[in-house]
């Protein structure tokens, strides 16, 4: 009798030891790598499931969590990557991610988030990648990003942000890539970017900016790519890019109804390689346009005036093996002729070519 009882006790003990592990993988979910990866993609969840403390990746895409309450993830201290795309989230409470001090990736794309209040990202001191694109966010309150001292990439494209105010990025001093495409921005207040002077990539395309935000952008120091396409800009002022001119390599100004550059627009710009100017209303380029460093330039669908003022462009085109399809709109007798081939520049005095240093970085 003693032996069967001993076997029963051992069996019950073994079963009891297995129960926590079995219970750690939520129903209908898939768990991998010894419960470190938990996949609950589109399984009908309406509340955040309980998972093992050792979980590092939690994928909760395509479920239904209208509100992320305070401490929703408190029992997941080792989480590194959290996926909450397409979860119909409307509200993120203050302290919703409290306890996630190891989190590096946070995906909140394609939800219905309208308001983000200060405190929403408390404790996320290691967060490096934050995806908030395709929501309905209207503003960034001061202090919202303060805990995010290691943030590198912030995607806020496809929201409804109307204005960037001073202090909007307070605390996010290491931010390098900022995407604000397809919002409703009509202005950037002076001081709006004071806390993110190390931005390298800045996308502002498809907004409502009617004037170049000189005061705000003048605080940036190392921008390598600036995208302003599809904004109703008419002119670019003097010194527009000077504060980061030694770093700027790619500039997008296509589809803006742009009519002119001020003579000093490109002062201080020395490394520009790629410029997009197609589908505008440009007649001329400024005399200090940085052709020397330029590798690619898109020009089509502009009413170019083929006079001697455009001779720098003609010389640059002559040196290219590709043939950008840009044509003269005036004078009338040269209309429709390719800038590279037209006789419109016959008689113009071309400056002596400066030798370039061999090699590229």
UniProtKB/Swiss-Prot annotation:
Glycans are attached at residue 146. Residues 1-24 form the signal peptide. Mostly monomeric. Interacts with collagen type II. Promotes attachment of chondrocytes, fibroblasts, and osteoblasts. This binding is mediated (at least for chondrocytes and fibroblasts) by the integrin alpha(2)beta(1). May play an important role in the regulation of chondrocyte growth and proliferation. Keywords: Disulfide bond, Extracellular matrix, Glycoprotein, Leucine-rich repeat, Repeat, Secreted, Signal. Pfam families: LRR_8, LRRNT. Disulfide bonds join 25-40, 306-348, 308-328. InterPro entries: Cys-rich_flank_reg_C, Leu-rich_rpt, Leu-rich_rpt_typical-subtyp, LRR_dom_sf, LRRNT, SLRP. Residues 302-350 form the LRRCT domain. The gene is CHAD. It comes from Bos taurus. SUPFAM superfamilies: L domain-like (SSF52058). This is Chondroadherin. GO terms for cellular component: extracellular region. Cartilage. Residues 25-54 form the LRRNT domain. LRR repeats lie at residues 78-99, 102-123, 126-147, 150-171, 174-195, 198-219, 222-243, 247-268, 271-292. It is found in: Secreted, Extracellular space, Extracellular matrix. Belongs to the small leucine-rich proteoglycan (SLRP) family. SLRP class IV subfamily.
